[in-house]
Amino acid sequence: MITERQSNILNLIVDLFTQTHEPVGSKALQSLIASSSATIRNDMAKLEKLGLLEKAHTSSGRMPSAAGFKYFVEHSLNLGSIDEQDLYQLVKAFDFEAFKLEDVLLRASQMLSDTTGYTAAILDVEPARQRLTGFDIVQLSSHDALAVLSLDESKPLTVQFAIPKNFMNRDLLVLKGIVADRLLGKDVMTVHYKLRTEIPQIVQKYFTVTDNVLDLFDYIFVGLFRETIFVSGKVAALDYAGLATYQFLDEEQRLALSIRQSLSEEEMATVQVADSSEPALANVTLLTYKFLIPYRGFGLLSLIGPVDMDYRRSVSLINVIGQLLAVKLRDYYRYLNSNHYEVH
């Protein structure tokens, strides 16, 4: 446990270092702390011994360690003010007509990345918490067709596929009927289970050759089990982390899993400082904010950046963007659920 003065010294060093990225000496703190330079140096030495500060190689000053940033986040972090120009740009960015949910999610991810200079990711509702509420097959030609799936009565998913060579005209209707009878209305986890257990047995009753039918089921439904994730600002990772992190950001399903694991069921927001079990994220900071997607559940907005980021500004920005996102989604779903056709 550190004293109140030591806590104030650590907070000031964090604030000064994130602004200048230069080591902080006792003289720089003397006008801000009502203590002598010797007392401040003594407290800085104690903070260093606790692992909260570390020496710079080229200066007598000190800078926060990863543990120091973590202590600051857990004990002293509060929201900073947002520049009026930043706020204006954010509000302006969300003033657009969205034609689908993905438009809104992508815009939020881009704005968080653009305003911070770091990497941003946004996730839709967790697949396991969604339900299959609609299914249809539209035959496009004698050789190909389009499967149209609906999740939570609002999110469409389309899959174009080649019709198996041994399919007869009625077989697409049979496949559609199996889905309607056995999978429609079920949550995604149940759909996954039935595709592995029940559906193969049912397919045997209707089809002589079953392998390609089961392959087709897998092809059509595999998208249900993938996270919907948008990542912006990947290239920035080369500056604040390195090649391993940059390459990891392309593995979007693994990234989505790491983001979900950073936040417990009860938490609405979290700041993870160099504390991820994923090696590619072990030396970066991961800020995650949970936001409501009306009628469907919660999505996640995340910022990935360096341990020495400006936490007050970053947390304030992710909160503001999260709030603007919630308002935009509320209006979007209100429009979807309204009778917007007018008869004159």
Swiss-Prot record:
SUPFAM superfamilies: GAF domain-like (SSF55781), Winged helix' DNA-binding domain (SSF46785). One of its GO terms (biological process) is negative regulation of DNA-templated transcription. GO terms for molecular function: DNA binding. Keywords: Repressor, Stress response, Transcription, Transcription regulation. InterPro entries: GAF-like_dom_sf (IPR029016), HrcA (IPR002571), HrcA_C (IPR021153), WH-like_DNA-bd_sf (IPR036388), WH_DNA-bd_sf (IPR036390), WHTH_HrcA_DNA-bd (IPR005104), WHTH_transcript_rep_HrcA_IDD (IPR023120). Negative regulator of class I heat shock genes (grpE-dnaK-dnaJ and groELS operons). Prevents heat-shock induction of these operons. Belongs to the HrcA family. This is Heat-inducible transcription repressor HrcA. It comes from Streptococcus equi subsp. equi (strain 4047).
